[in-house]
Amino acid sequence: MNRFYKLTALSLLISAAAASQSLAFDPVAEAAKHIASMGVGKKDWPQWGGSPSRNNTVQDADIPIEWDVKSGQNVVWSAPLGSETYGNPVVANGKVFVGTNNGNGYVSRFPNTKDLGALVCFDEKDGKFLWQHSNEKLPTGRVHDWPDQGVCAAPVVDGDRLWYITNRGEVVCLDTEGFHDGQNDGPFNTEAYENLDEADVVWSFNMMSQLGVSQHNMCSCSLTYVGDLLFVSTGNGVDEGHITLPKSEAPSFVCMNRQTGEVLWTDNSPGANVLHGQWSSPAYGTLGGVNQVIFGGGDGWLYSFLAEGENGKAKMLWKFDCNPKGSFYALNRATRNHIIATPVIYDGLVYVGVGEDPEHGEGGGHLWCIDPTKRGDVSPTQVFHVDDPKTPIAHRRLQAMIEKDGELERDNPNSAAVWHHVGNDPEEFEQTMHRTCGTVAIKDDLLFVADFSGLLHCIDAKTGQGYWTYDMFAASWASPLIVGNKIYIGDEDGDIGIFEVSKEFNLIAEINMGSAVYTTPVVANDTLFIANRNRLFAIRQGAQSEGIE
């Protein structure tokens, strides 16, 4: 079977009004400018996506296109992680942070047989273990805290402070120095253990007890911030039976003061319409002159809010239904999806794809480009009843439009859809956009995204035209990394595919990491960091380490 497919047909181009801004837009320079404003090194990678725009595109660097984890060729160091790793690495101020489980037993008081959520800190230069923030599993079990999954979120770092969400639904601020600086930073300073292998907690906020949230399986939001505003998706979701939301009134989206943990505003717009869980992460940008924080909802809608809120409350700017109105939700056979990917901001536009918990299988997907300058309901269409063709029908959880009941949809004159990509031929597997957990990466107006069915897509970011796909023959949970003119992407077989950033297909190399790669590679300080299922690797041109079996 041919693994490479060149696409020639156009995707549905809904509107070109916002599709062309500056041809000279440089996402690398934008991210570098933001990173330079933070208390981190100028070539660090201090959060998921590098900056609040979440575009996983870094400065050009001499990153290898060949290495060997067994012989140690071009590997600076590697360090063991837990038995399962889903947290994307973050690199800041000489340290590497990654979420995993306790399978390696780094902390002296917990044997490696003790299931924990763990955020582990390593020395960037040699991979030496420094400390671990350990979180015991919730007693309610898998409905709230799935066994062995560890910490699935990435932290955000500024100076000597780090913020992330634990497996227990707690937003915590940690001292990146741990107790190695000889101090117990507060206001929280009642840690039971202050050993060097322990984390130093500055403050902690429990969303389950303090906001009434009932997270489903896991809270996996990777936080971002601007100024002192910290943005959080709570993970509020369905019960163990997957039928109802036990806490439909609890917030889905939160803005906090990152210095103190004070809640500044909340919103529960998805409400009882959450389909399953809420596992997306927010993005932030100044769009149309307005500071916007953008959240992917568990109801399949994308929401934008005024970042600072208004009078202590959330102020929604726009919302966009990312699913066809006739799609429906049902366990293991749904055509309606929610949003797991992180929205990405590029050249004034917003990009996001829809997906589902991989445990619920593959399915058709939708990739959108959205103009964020409109207001209100900016979905492509709205639903009406034939008996009242002027009043839009409010959204329903399982199916927005039921034709047999006399409902119909009409084009929304206020639509913010720029383009919609479902693939160039949805009848052909290799030319279909499937469900995705992955976040897009964009450079030179070329968008790259991997879907859960294992296809890497190259798409025109301005028009939605598909250029090519590549079948990795393995599921992909990850997102692409763009370094200079190369793309790096991992899959469940443990392969890292390396491709040229081009509308013409060019596979440069495929390198196996020895175990499944569920995370996204990152580059910091001219070093490539990759976490496979159970090990973290630092890869650099010309390096040599002992290697692993």
Residues of each region from the PLM?
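Bacterial N-terminal signal peptides
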Residues: 8-17
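Noncatalytic, solvent-exposed loop/strand surfaces
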Residues: 21-549
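Intrinsically disordered or highly flexible coil/loop and linker segments, enriched in small
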Residues: 2-3, 17, 359
